[in-house]
Amino acid sequence: MRTGKQYLKSLNDGRTVILDGEVVGNVLXH
Protein backbone atom coordinates (compact mmCIF):
# COMPACT_ATOMS: atom_id res chain seq x y z
CA MET A 1 0.00 0.00 0.00
CA ARG A 2 1.38 3.41 -0.97
CA THR A 3 1.13 6.48 1.16
CA GLY A 4 -0.52 9.62 -0.13
CA LYS A 5 2.89 11.23 -0.54
CA GLN A 6 4.15 8.32 -2.63
CA TYR A 7 1.01 8.48 -4.77
CA LEU A 8 1.43 12.21 -5.43
CA LYS A 9 5.09 11.70 -6.29
CA SER A 10 4.16 8.98 -8.77
CA LEU A 11 1.75 11.38 -10.49
CA ASN A 12 4.54 13.91 -10.99
CA ASP A 13 6.70 11.63 -13.14
CA GLY A 14 6.69 13.79 -16.25
CA ARG A 15 3.55 12.38 -17.80
CA THR A 16 1.31 14.61 -19.88
CA VAL A 17 -2.11 15.08 -18.34
CA ILE A 18 -4.94 16.68 -20.29
CA LEU A 19 -7.77 18.13 -18.25
CA ASP A 20 -10.74 19.77 -19.96
CA GLY A 21 -8.70 20.03 -23.16
CA GLU A 22 -5.78 21.79 -21.48
CA VAL A 23 -2.37 20.25 -20.97
CA VAL A 24 -1.52 20.27 -17.28
CA GLY A 25 2.25 20.41 -16.88
CA ASN A 26 2.49 19.75 -13.17
CA VAL A 27 -0.36 17.71 -11.75
CA LEU A 28 0.49 18.60 -8.15
CA UNK A 29 0.39 22.36 -8.75
CA HIS A 30 -2.89 22.21 -10.64
Curated annotation (Swiss-Prot):
GO terms for molecular function: oxidoreductase activity, acting on the CH-CH group of donors; pyrrole-2-carboxylate monooxygenase (NADH) activity. The keyword Flavoprotein applies. InterPro entries: AcylCoA_DH/oxidase_NM_dom_sf (IPR009100). It comes from the Bacteria. Keywords: FAD, Flavoprotein, Monooxygenase, NAD, Oxidoreductase. It catalyses: pyrrole-2-carboxylate + NADH + O2 + H(+) = 5-hydroxypyrrole-2-carboxylate + NAD(+) + H2O. Its cofactor is FAD. Its EC number is 1.14.13.130. Homotrimer. Monooxygenase that initiates the degradation of pyrrole-2-carboxylate, which allows Arthrobacter sp. strain Py1 to grow on pyrrole-2-carboxylate as sole carbon, nitrogen, and energy source. To a lesser extent, can also use pyrrole, pyrrole-2-aldehyde, and indole-2-carboxylate as substrate. This is Pyrrole-2-carboxylate oxygenase. It comes from Arthrobacter sp. (strain Py1).
